[in-house]
Amino acid sequence: MLSENTTILMANGEIKDIANVTANSYVMCADGSAARVINVTQGYQKIYNIQQKTKHRAFEGEPGRLDPRRRTVYQRLALQCTAGHKLSVRVPTKPLLEKSGRNATKYKVRWRNLQQCQTLDGRIIIIPKNHHKTFPMTVEGEFAAKRFIEEMERSKGEYFNFDIEVRDLDYLDAQLRISSCIRFGPVLAGNGVLSKFLTGRSDLVTPAVKSMAWMLGLWLGDSTTKEPEISVDSLDPKLMESLRENAKIWGLYLTVCDDHVPLRAKHVRLHYGDGPDENRKTRNLRKNNPFWKAVTILKFKRDLDGEKQIPEFMYGEHIEVREAFLAGLIDSDGYVVKKGEGPESYKIAIQTVYSSIMDGIVHISRSLGMSATVTTRSAREEIIEGRKVQCQFTYDCNVAGGTTSQNVLSYCRSGHKTREVPPIIKREPVYFSFTDDFQGESTVYGLTIEGHKNFLLGNKIEVKSCRGCCVGEQLKISQKKNLKHCVACPRKGIKYFYKDWSGKNRVCARCYGRYKFSGHHCINCKYVPEAREVKKAKDKGEKLGITPEGLPVKGPECIKCGGILQFDAVRGPHKSCGNNAGARIC
């Protein structure tokens, strides 16, 4: 069962709160079909937060302390469900060859297999388990080990896909738990709202409809909200010509305006009707303009304050319309970087100052089967073309998705952003690793779907239909939590730990790198500061504090807890644990 804060993607593309979903309504399934809701149940149970693991760290360090808005990880995938709710989990099956023994005297092959396991309350569940097999360290032994690996790869496949209840996740060992992933899926069907508005038919996706979607994306990226005016890079003639051609389809012609001081960005107005034969003062700019009607009537411009936004119906539009719309945003405000070879190497970044546009970019990207993350930058002063510019708080939307991203770029018209259409488009679910944490008690709802199909949440996460295991409170009984924690930061679930100041493997890779570079750590909260944070603490001067043993100590102040930073002049295997250089015992 799912928390009352959960949103559901309905069959018509609408995103609805689960509390408002009724029996006999239709939801969007993972395979693109619509399925009827047979029954809706309600209860009050303990819930767990299933949350995407990310590399966002701004909320942990100095950026989050200086700017409260950067403490939020925007558009992080998550769902709240009960302990008895089943998750569709995937783990890799790739066997590994490594050396074993005190002096590496044997070859060891580590592999995984699905097998039965009995829980502490007597249930039988099927989960993957780690196994290993040893071979002598000889030429024959190495050959036999490689043959065994090939046999395992043929018989096991690339991944194990299995269903597991949330309360049983602790029965996976640490390595399996870290590599476990759930998925979100693309939206394969379209609601056709834009097509219906432009052509009168929701199933009609013509080149004219796609050209309008592209112009709407271009307008949302860089334009004024007062009139149909778009800023275009004057050094990109292909973009200007493409805008002229797409506008002509809708009976629009362009006029280029310039500032008092000529700039690289030119203001292009979209007038309706034939171009004037002579210079006249009155032109159809907003009156009868089909582009401006789409902007205002379909709510791309908010009514109350006139701010730009991406309306929710665009999240579930036809795939071609979504791709053309996103391409317009990329042409206007996006960057395309190619790293390595192959279609998977394209990385797309779109910057915006509007939170509603950021939400729309992420939703549309995920609905096309692409991964999307958001980083932030605080308000700042920058110098652009020799001028000081006050930049607002910015959202950086980063998108990647293999052939799906390349197909989006094929709709772009900017000369250096457009790419060829890929020969094959693989629109598949995207997997992500996750953590699970207890949240408390809440009102929960369970949806029973016809055919027990998997359906999509509002954030595109694929979930299973509720069955008998969801009814009633399910006890979570397990021996221990297998995920490890870094002692210096909140990070958990990481594979490898490194030696800290005590000589034990207790810190993650980032904190280990900081400690190795700066040599400082807090004696109270064990936080490892960055070099710039150490410099600021030293500039403030030393302060008097108390060690955990109750002794007075003097040193730089920890900016996180107000404790004392200790400096270890010698780090590594030759460090003496009793060395307190930099934090003087008084």
Swiss-Prot record:
Entry GO CC: nucleus
SMART domains in alphabetical order: HintN
Main location per the UniProt record: nucleus
Organism: Saccharomyces cerevisiae (strain ATCC 204508 / S288c) (Baker's yeast)
Entry GO MF terms: DNA binding; endonuclease activity; zinc ion binding
Its job: Initiation of mating type interconversion. This protein is a site-specific endonuclease that cleaves a site in the mat locus on chromosome III. The double-strand break is followed by a unidirectional gene conversion event that replaces the information at the mat locus by information copied from either of the two homologous loci (HMR and HML) that reside at the extremity of the chromosome III. Endonuclease expression takes place in late G1 just before cells enter S phase.
InterPro entries (UniProt xref): Hint_dom_N, Hint_dom_sf, Hom_end_hint, Homing_endonuc_PI-Sce, Homing_endonucl, INTEIN, Intein_endonuc_central
Additional record remark: The metal-binding domain form zinc-fingers that are involved in binding of the DNA.
Gene designation per UniProt: HO
Pfam families hit by this protein: Hom_end, Hom_end_hint
Protein name, entry field: Homothallic switching endonuclease
Keyword Zinc-finger: yes
GO biological process: gene conversion at mating-type locus; intein-mediated protein splicing; mating type switching
Keyword list, A-Z: DNA-binding, Endonuclease, Hydrolase, Metal-binding, Nuclease, Nucleus, Zinc, Zinc-finger
Domain named DOD-type homing endonuclease: residues: 215-370
Highest rank taxon of the organism: Eukaryota
Keyword Endoplasmic reticulum (UniProt): no
UniProt subcellular location: Nucleus
Post-translational modification: Rapidly degraded via the ubiquitin-26S proteasome system through two ubiquitin-conjugating enzymes UBC2/RAD6 and UBC3/CDC34.
